[in-house]
Amino acid sequence: MGRYSRESDNVAKSCKARGPNLRVHFKNTHETAQAIKRMPLRRAQRYLKAVIDQKECVPFRRFNGGVGRCAQAKQWKTTQGRWPKKSAEFLLQLLRNAEANADCKGLDADRLVVHHIQVNRAQCLRRRTYRAHGRINPYMSSPCHVEVILTEKEELVSKATDDEPAKKKLSKKKLQRQKEKMLRSE
């Protein structure tokens, strides 16, 4: 079992999943993970399926050099976005794994929220491509490690309301006038 970079506050109400050395682009996966952070589990799954179908885009905020603009990015208050299909598929699979772990622990899947998701660079894999005049150039891939922690959302307790509304504070002058009116009416 690998070490996670962060531990949950309430271990009994959370579940984990991780994927080491995934053959998927680090930069695309990082942006996709940032988009689903703090989302409810069901919404995150719907969102990733929509990204695969190109119904919603992933906003590119950090690794956005050369990324084109798209209208769907407006809902994220940015202009640049893409639809990284492979990253979305990998993260969707990881969320399914975490959901299965939650089910095994007896947690309610409808109340789960993506509490923590982190994407780290893995060791680059080296291949080669052959160029003109007998030269050879590297053909590198940038895999990544992904870890996710889902936490059950706690019920918010609403503030108790008093039966009587709070009385207005009155100045001494107004209290005096009210007393005078009461005396006159009697």
From Swiss-Prot:
The modification Phosphoserine is found at S158. Pfam families: Ribosomal_L22. Keywords: Phosphoprotein, Ribonucleoprotein, Ribosomal protein. The modification Phosphothreonine is found at T161. Coiled coil: none annotated. Transmembrane segments: none annotated. GO terms for biological process: cytoplasmic translation. Residues 159-186 are annotated as: Disordered. SUPFAM superfamilies: Ribosomal protein L22. One of its GO terms (molecular function) is structural constituent of ribosome. It comes from the Eukaryota. GO terms for cellular component: cytosolic large ribosomal subunit; cytosolic ribosome. Residues 177-186 have a biased composition (Basic and acidic residues). Belongs to the universal ribosomal protein uL22 family. This is Large ribosomal subunit protein uL22. It comes from Drosophila melanogaster. The gene is RpL17.
